[in-house]
A protein has these predicted regions:
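Charged, low-complexity intrinsically disordered terminal segments
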Residues: 1-216
Length: 216
């Protein structure tokens, strides 16, 4: 079985030891490090991080969500109390979109990009509704993720419920959240009570007063 892993270097600087990485590679697993941290790297590029969590299996199944590969996610260690996270399982043609997302990142450093052999056909499944996975990256000129959220907030008629570990808003996004609540949409946000990033937690709290005053 071909097993490939991409991980972001910044998030593993102090937690992934060279010996562990070597054991993974010795087991026949291919590994790519996204945007390795180097003191000579331009600070703008240093901020280009890959925060996506994607697992694709044989073209049949795709998992995505907030779950990393780390001991606290398996409750082997306790860092911030009981660790709760969410992921979803997808089947059908949407799986190919996740395969392409993975290959796009993998092939950034490949001299001979591999596409076709990994794009296995995804058997169709019967389902109500429509699933359209999307992604964005620092190389894009268009902010896909932000645009999707803005469209959801501007079109919503009944409710918008969002669960996120980090609430980092620009003025446009904060205004969209407040405006949706003010026109009668039930807007609810769920955030961690115990932060893993204190700076991000403080930044999120700076928005609370303005959001709650608008009815969020």
């Amino acid at each position: 079985v071909e097993v490939r892993i991409i991980f972001d270097d910044f998030g593993n600087l102090t937690r992934l030891h060279d010996e562990t990485l070597q054991q993974i590679q010795n087991a026949g697993i291919e590994v790519e490090v996204f945007n390795p941290v180097h003191r000579y790297v331009n600070r703008i590029y240093f901020n280009y991080r890959d925060h996506r969590k994607i697992a694709v299996i044989d073209g049949y199944y795709a998992y995505t969500g907030g779950i990393n590969i780390a001991d606290e996610y398996a409750n082997l260690i306790v860092r911030f109390g009981h660790w709760k996270d969410t992921a979803i399982l997808l089947r059908g043609e949407a799986v190919q979109s996740f395969t392409l997302m993975f290959l796009q990142m993998w092939n950034l450093t490949e001299k001979e990009p591999r596409w076709d052999e990994a794009l296995l056909p995804s058997p169709p499944v019967e389902a109500e509704g429509y699933v359209m996975p999307y992604c964005d990256c620092p190389l894009d000129d268009y902010k896909v993720g932000e645009s999707v959220y803005m469209d959801i907030l501007n079109r919503a008629k009944d409710y918008v419920h969002i669960m996120t570990p980090y609430l980092i808003l620009d003025n446009e996004m904060e205004t969209a959240l407040k405006f949706a609540a003010q026109r009668g949409v039930d807007v609810k946000l769920i955030l961690p009570g115990i932060p893993d990033k204190k700076a991000a937690y403080a930044l999120a709290k700076s928005h609370y007063q303005y959001l709650t005053a608008a009815g969020v």
